[in-house]
Amino acid sequence: MVFIFMFLFAFSVFPQTCRQLAKEVKPTLSPETRKAYDVKLAEAFDQFTKQGGNADSTIWLGRRTAYLGNYKDAIRIFSEGLSRYPTDARFFRHRGHRYITIRCFDEAIRDLDRAASLVKSKPDQVEPDGLPNERNVPTSTLQTNIYYHLGLAHYLKGEFDPAYAAFMQAFNIAKNADMQVAAANWVFMSAMRLGKSKEAAQFIGKIPDNLDLIENADYYKLIRLYQGKMKPEDLLKEAASNATIGYGLGNWYLYNGRREETMKIFRQIVAGDQWASFGYIAAEAELKR
C-alpha cells in the first residue's frame, strides 16, 4: 500500500511532459521507400558508432530516425546530443522541428529561440538535405530553418506577431528562391491574420513571376493565388490530396469571407494521411481554436 501511494505521489509531483503525452503517427510509406529509409538509418547508426557519437553523426541519426516516423526517439537522440554539445545550435533546430511535429509548440519555441541566440552574428551555413531534391541541391540553411520553424511554432499557437517577425527574418536571410518563396507564403498569411492586408498585398506582390524553383512549387502556386494570378478553382483538385495547397487555399477562402469553405477544406486535410506536414498541423490547430 505504501509503495502504491509513493508511486501515485511521484506522478502527482512530476507530471508527464508534452513529449510523453503527445501522439505520434507514422507516415504512410511504400515498401520501397521504407526499405530505403531503413538502409539510411542503419548507415547513420554505423557512422554514429564509428565516429564515437560526434555531433554530425548524432544529428544524422536523429534525422534518419525521424524520417521513419519515430519522432519521440529522434527528440531523445537530439537531447542526448545536447548533453554533449550544448552550444551546437543544430540540435536545438532539429529538436525544435520535431517538437512541432508532435504538437509541443512551447517546447519548440524554447528550442528555436535558443538556436537563434546561438547563431546570432555568426556566418550562416548550408544545411544538407536528408531527402535530396531532383537536382541534389540543398535549398535551406541553418539560420533560415531556425527562423522558419520558429515562425511556424508561433503561428500554430496563434501568436501571429512573433510569427510574422520570424518568417520575415527567414525571408530576408534566404539565399535562394525556394526558401524565399516558402518564407514569403507564411509572411503573407501571418500579416493577413494581423489585419495587415494592405502590407501583405504589397509584400506578396513583389514576388516575381517565372522563378526557377527546385522543390517549393506548391508555395509558389499559393503566392500566385494571393497575387490574383491563379483562381481558387485551379487548386481545388490538388488541395484534396495536398495539405500544403489545401491549407493555403483554405486561408484564401478565409481572407475572402468564405468561412464555410475554409472549414470544409481544413476538415478535409485532417481527414487525410499527411499528419506530419505543416499544412496538416496548421489545419488541425485552426479547428481546435
Map each language-model feature to its residues.
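N-terminal leader/linker segments that initiate helical-solenoid repeat arrays
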Residues: 13-60, 67-68
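Residue-level recognition of tetratricopeptide repeat
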Residues: 63, 97, 152, 189-192, ...
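Short coil turns that delineate tetratricopeptide repeat
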Residues: 52, 86, 120, 141, ...
